Regions:
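Extracellular glycan-associated modules
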Residues: 1-200
C-alpha cells in the first residue's frame, strides 16, 4: 500500500506526463475488454449451445441453418444429443422424430442425419443420405435397446464414407457406406413427439 502512495506522490497526474500515464492505463483496459468480447464471441460461435435447458419433445423446436457451423471437410460431422424417454406409449406405432437436419419426415430424401425412435421398440433409427453414381440413397442404422426412464446420450460421427454411433460414449455401431455421406445444410428440427431432449 505504501508503494502505491509513493508512486502517486511521485507522479503528478495533472502534469502532461501524468495524463499520458492515465491515457496508457485506460487504453490497456479498453484493449483488454475488447479482446475479451472478441474471444467470447468466437468461443460462442465455435461451441454453440442451442438449448440451455431441456425442452419437451412434444414441442417442435427449429435451429435455423445460419446458426449451425457446417463442416469444412465433406462428409465429416458429429451430432450429439441427450435424450430421456418415459415410455413408448405416445404415438405408438409411428416413427417419433428426435431430430432431423434438412427435410422433415421419416426417410425423406436429403435428411442427413435424421434420428427417430422406432414405432414399436425401444430402438433408435438413424438415417443418413449418401451420394453414389449421382443418386441420393438413404442409409439406415438401428441402435437397439436404449435405456428407458433415464437420460442417455447418442452421438453420430461421420468420417468420409463411414459412420460410428455411440451410446453413452461407447461405440455401438460402425458402418461403412459405398457412397459419400451428405451433410444437409438445412435447419435442424427437434422433437414434436414426447419426452425431453437436450442437445448441443
Amino acid at each position: 500500500m505504501n508503494r502505491l502512495v509513493n508512486i502517486r506522490n511521485q507522479i503528478n497526474f495533472k502534469s502532461k506526463k501524468g495524463k499520458i500515464y492515465i491515457a496508457i492505463i485506460v487504453a490497456v483496459f479498453v484493449i483488454l475488454v475488447i479482446n475479451y468480447i472478441i474471444k467470447k464471441r468466437r468461443w460462442d460461435r465455435a461451441n454453440p449451445i442451442f438449448f440451455s435447458n431441456s425442452i419437451p419433445a412434444d414441442t417442435r423446436a427449429i435451429v435455423p441453418s445460419r446458426k449451425i457451423k457446417n463442416s469444412i471437410n465433406k462428409g465429416h460431422f458429429t451430432y450429439m444429443i441427450w435424450i430421456y424417454v418415459e415410455d413408448l406409449k405416445y404415438r405408438y406405432g409411428v416413427h417419433k422424430n428426435i431430430f432431423t437436419k434438412g427435410n422433415i419426415g421419416y426417410y425423406s430424401e436429403s435428411q442427413s442425419p435424421g434420428m427417430y425412435i422406432s414405432p414399436k421398440r425401444n430402438s433408435i433409427e438413424i438415417v443418413l443420405s449418401t451420394m453414389a453414381n449421382n443418386q441420393i440413397i438413404n442409409e439406415k442404422m438401428i441402435l437397439d435397446d436404449f435405456p428407458m426412464k433415464k437420460w442417455f446420450s447418442v452421438a453420430v460421427v461421420a468420417h468420409e464414407k463411414s459412420v460410428a454411433v455411440f451410446l453413452n460414449g461407447e461405440l455401438s455401431i460402425s458402418k461403412p457406406f459405398s457412397g459419400d455421406i451428405i451433410e444437409n445444410t438445412g435447419n435442424i428440427v427437434i422433437g414434436g413427439n414426447g419426452g425431453f431432449i437436450k442437445g448441443e
